[in-house]
Amino acid sequence: ALASFHNPGIVRVLRYFRANETAYMVMDYETGQPLQRWLVGRLPLDKTMLLRIVRPLLDGLAVVHGTGFLHRDIKPENIYIRADGSPVLLDFGSARRVEADGSDQALTAVLTPGFAPAEQYHRHGKQGPWTDLYALAGVMYWMVTGNRPMEAFARLREDTMPTAAEIGNK
């Protein structure tokens, strides 16, 4: 199913296969640079530039989510800015199909503090499109403020993370 995704906002998976008790994906080679390198000297981003990056990623996620899959590891390191300036979401190695009830068939926890929502910290946490959207919102926060978001559980205990508007007004 991953090989059937065709959208400019997500890397194209050409082939998926298993060998030696391991799963492999062959993907398009993308030229450009990682988002965090591309953003050096550009932070914080204004609304126009933020939307130029985020909209194609949201369009790509709509394709992924429409087939019942989740990326599960959206973070700045997995977003590339191509030579033409367009963004592409990479690294579908953690992607999994999720059941309609939000249960995940994966046994592995995938987390990047600040970008992973609370449900990814629990083996049986219910995941859905909201899981990827939380992570993308964390990337947006970082692009607007220049600060990585707080870890989800730290925010659940005591949310001291300043809003993007508060940081922008300093």
Regions found by a protein language model. Name each.
Residues N20-P34, W38:
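Conserved short submotifs of the Hanks-type protein kinase catalytic core
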Residues H6-G9:
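Flexible N-lobe loop architecture of eukaryotic-like protein kinase catalytic domains
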Residues L58-F69:
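Protein kinase catalytic-loop region centered on the HRD/HxD motif
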Residues I53-V54:
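Activation segment signature within eukaryotic-like protein kinase domains
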Residues I81-G85:
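Activation-loop N-terminal segment of eukaryotic-like protein kinases
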Residues G114-K170:
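C-terminal lobe helix-coil module of Hanks-type protein kinase domains
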Residues Y16:
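Activation-segment/catalytic-loop signature of the eukaryotic protein kinase fold
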